[in-house]
Amino acid sequence: MAELKITQVRGTIGARWNQRESLRTLGLRKIRQSVVREDNAQTRGLIKTVHHLVVVEEV
């Protein structure tokens, strides 16, 4: 399966609770931190919640 590189580019100050929890679930804690995750429906749903806080690249 394909993998996605997810990088947090904006902070969570002023973000809603579910957006903060989605970032934590993805494994992101700091700005400019990147993680590689499998491309599946669960990951896509989390990204959809925080699309304005992250940048997604296909690896």
From Swiss-Prot:
Assigned GO CC terms: cytosolic large ribosomal subunit
Top-level taxon in the UniProt lineage: Bacteria
InterPro entries named among the record's database cross-references: Ribo_uL30_ferredoxin-like_sf, Ribosomal_uL30_bac-type, Ribosomal_uL30_CS, Ribosomal_uL30_ferredoxin-like
SUPFAM superfamilies the UniProt entry points to: Ribosomal protein L30p/L7e (SSF55129)
GO biological process, one term: translation
Cross-referenced NCBIfam families: rpmD_bact
Subunit relationships: Part of the 50S ribosomal subunit.
Family listed: Belongs to the universal ribosomal protein uL30 family.
Protein name according to UniProt: Large ribosomal subunit protein uL30
Organism: Mycobacterium sp. (strain JLS)
Phylogenetic classification of the source organism: Bacteria, Bacillati, Actinomycetota, Actinomycetes, Mycobacteriales
